[in-house]
């Protein structure tokens, strides 16, 4: 049985990780443990690079907390221009898989608060009246009226980040370069 460390205690993220591992390895083939670790980036990362660094840093910190595990999973949501998205980083042994989620264009009323230094989740809570938006459907769930959720969008990206660990083509050695 695989021991999977989720570098988060957020239920929406842990549910997405559970769905992805169910799809790839099957129910009952792993156990997930959530740990609260620092991302090393601001609470609201801005830009793809900063957001990706946050996800990688979460994995690094989770590995330090639980080095005996088999998988470490980091998810970091960010803002780039007028879009929200997230990076998924998964490590297993000495390999890494990464994927970026789908993006959602945000309305100006939300972006205004973000430009003033507030987090997307806090802005969504004020506008929607839902205090724990980030732990439920997220901005995605609110704006799509539940057709998509934070969990469903992250699930898809996590499936892509898991590909290097189960697709045999990723295990094949690179062909050697021909002599010149």
Swiss-Prot record:
UniProt EC number: 3.6.1.73
Residues binding Mg(2+), per UniProt: 38, 68
- Name the enzyme group at the top EC level: hydrolase
**Gene Ontology terms describing biological process:** nucleotide metabolic process; thiamine metabolic process
Catalyzed reaction equations: XTP + H2O = XDP + phosphate + H(+); ITP + H2O = IDP + phosphate + H(+)
Query: Which keywords label this protein?
Result: Hydrolase, Magnesium, Manganese, Metal-binding, Nucleotide metabolism, Nucleotide-binding
Q: How is the cofactor bound?
A: Binds 1 divalent metal cation per subunit; can use either Mg(2+) or Mn(2+).
Domain of life, source organism: Bacteria
* Residues that coordinate or bind substrate: 8-13, 68-69
Q: Which cofactor does it need?
A: Mg(2+); Mn(2+)
Function, as annotated, reads: Phosphatase that hydrolyzes non-canonical purine nucleotides such as XTP and ITP to their respective diphosphate derivatives. Probably excludes non-canonical purines from DNA/RNA precursor pool, thus preventing their incorporation into DNA/RNA and avoiding chromosomal lesions.
Q: How does it assemble?
A: Homodimer.
Similarity comment: family membership: Belongs to the YjjX NTPase family.
Q: What is this protein called?
A: Inosine/xanthosine triphosphatase
Source organism: Yersinia pseudotuberculosis serotype O:3 (strain YPIII)
């Amino acid at each position: 049985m695989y021991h999977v460390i989720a570098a988060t205690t957020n239920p929406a993220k842990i549910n997405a990780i559970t769905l992805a591992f169910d799809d790839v390895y099957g129910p009952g083939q792993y156990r997930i443990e959530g740990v609260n670790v620092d991302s090393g980036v601001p609470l609201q990362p801005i830009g793809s690079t900063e957001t990706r660094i946050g996800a990688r840093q979460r994995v690094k910190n989770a590995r330090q907390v639980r080095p005996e595990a088999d998988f470490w999973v980091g998810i970091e949501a960010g803002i780039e221009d007028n879009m929200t998205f997230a990076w998924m980083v998964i490590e297993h042994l000495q390999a890494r898989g990464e994927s970026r989620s789908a993006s959602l264009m945000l309305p100006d009323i939300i972006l205004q608060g973000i430009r003033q230094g507030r987090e997307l989740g806090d802005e969504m809570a004020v506008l929607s009246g839902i205090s724990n938006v980030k732990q439920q459907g997220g901005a995605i769930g609110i704006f799509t009226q539940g057709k998509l959720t934070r969990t469903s969008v992250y699930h898809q990206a996590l499936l892509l980040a898991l590909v290097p660990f189960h697709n045999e083509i990723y295990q094949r050695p690179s062909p050697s370069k021909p002599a010149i």
